[in-house]
Regions:
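Adenosine-nucleotide cofactor-binding segment
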Residues: 3-64
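Glycine-rich phosphate-binding loop and adjacent beta-alpha segment
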Residues: 4, 60-132
Length: 132
């Protein structure tokens, strides 16, 4: 993202991990998903909305991201770690009904992918493009 001039915001658990994301990885900002004010903090940092969201978590993180997605946003889905060990539906309100409506009205593209299906043989190319 930063290579293309985009604002890049990370989400991590704890202040030390957020410090690492900003200072070592070079992200513009990082929001602590363990904070009681996580959704508000994310909204403040993403004050112009979100155009690209790499979904790898799901759960309350995706719940906080959903209202911030801009029209024509793109969401590559690589994982949903918040639900990997789930054996039942998650507690709380069912937000799934909102997702198709949001995808339609905001014309958002959401696509799942397994990295090794298409890109496993291009790891070296990706690494050289992403690591300065």
């Amino acid at each position: 993202g930063k290579i293309k001039g985009l604002k890049v915001v990370g989400i991590a658990g704890g202040s030390e991990k957020c410090r690492y994301v900003v200072e070592e990885l070079g992200f513009d900002a990082c929001v602590d998903h363990k904070s009681d004010t996580f959704a508000d903090d994310l909204a403040k940092v993403c004050d112009k909305g979100i155009d690209i969201y790499f979904e790898n978590v799901g759960g309350k993180v995706f719940d906080a991201v959903m209202p911030l997605l801009n029209a024509r946003a793109r969401i590559p889905v690589c994982g949903l770690i918040a639900g990997y060990n789930a054996t039942d539906l998650p507690e709380g309100p069912d937000r799934f009904a909102l997702l198709p409506r949001m995808l339609l009205t905001k014309r958002i593209r959401m696509q799942g992918f397994i990295v090794f299906d298409d890109f496993g043989d291009r790891h070296a190319e990706f690494f050289s493009a992403m690591v300065p």
